[in-house]
């Protein structure tokens, strides 16, 4: 017996504002039913010795510590800018 009906598929499609044909609804019903069946098979696994996890891989901070460093001299920065004035880089206006 199917756990997900064609009517369920049509209802969810309607909620998601998706227009699907009857043939598509039947196709999706079979696919979703197969997914639910597979998920139910996972419930049969013996996981008594498996520790609960929140991540598959161990989490570690890959970011470096935020340490201030001496920047480039203003002249060095401005020589790469297409336009500058009063030691500031000029850019085209973004807002009117």
UniProtKB/Swiss-Prot annotation:
GO biological process: glutaminyl-tRNAGln biosynthesis via transamidation; regulation of translational fidelity; translation
Source superkingdom: Bacteria
Catalytic reaction list: L-glutamyl-tRNA(Gln) + L-glutamine + ATP + H2O = L-glutaminyl-tRNA(Gln) + L-glutamate + ADP + phosphate + H(+); L-aspartyl-tRNA(Asn) + L-glutamine + ATP + H2O = L-asparaginyl-tRNA(Asn) + L-glutamate + ADP + phosphate + 2 H(+)
The keyword Transmembrane helix belongs to this UniProt entry's keyword annotation: no
Keywords associated with the record: ATP-binding, Ligase, Nucleotide-binding, Protein biosynthesis
The keyword Lipid metabolism appears for this protein: no
EC category name: ligase
Pfam families documented for this protein: GatC
A molecular-function term among this protein's GO annotations: asparaginyl-tRNA synthase (glutamine-hydrolyzing) activity
Enzyme Commission number, as recorded: 6.3.5.-
Family: Belongs to the GatC family.
Record note on quaternary structure: Heterotrimer of A, B and C subunits.
Job of this protein: Allows the formation of correctly charged Asn-tRNA(Asn) or Gln-tRNA(Gln) through the transamidation of misacylated Asp-tRNA(Asn) or Glu-tRNA(Gln) in organisms which lack either or both of asparaginyl-tRNA or glutaminyl-tRNA synthetases. The reaction takes place in the presence of glutamine and ATP through an activated phospho-Asp-tRNA(Asn) or phospho-Glu-tRNA(Gln).
Protein's name in the database: Aspartyl/glutamyl-tRNA(Asn/Gln) amidotransferase subunit C
Gene: gatC
């Amino acid at each position: 017996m199917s756990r997900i009906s064609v009517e369920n598929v049509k209802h969810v499609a309607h909620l998601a504002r998706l227009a699907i044909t009857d043939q598509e609804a039947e196709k999706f019903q079979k696919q979703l039913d197969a997914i639910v069946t597979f998920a139910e098979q996972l419930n049969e696994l013996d996981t008594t010795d498996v520790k609960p996890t929140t991540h598959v891989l161990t989490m570690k901070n890959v970011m470096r510590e935020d340490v201030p460093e001496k920047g480039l001299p203003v002249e060095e920065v401005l020589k790469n800018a297409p336009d500058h004035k009063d030691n500031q880089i000029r850019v085209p206006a973004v807002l009117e």
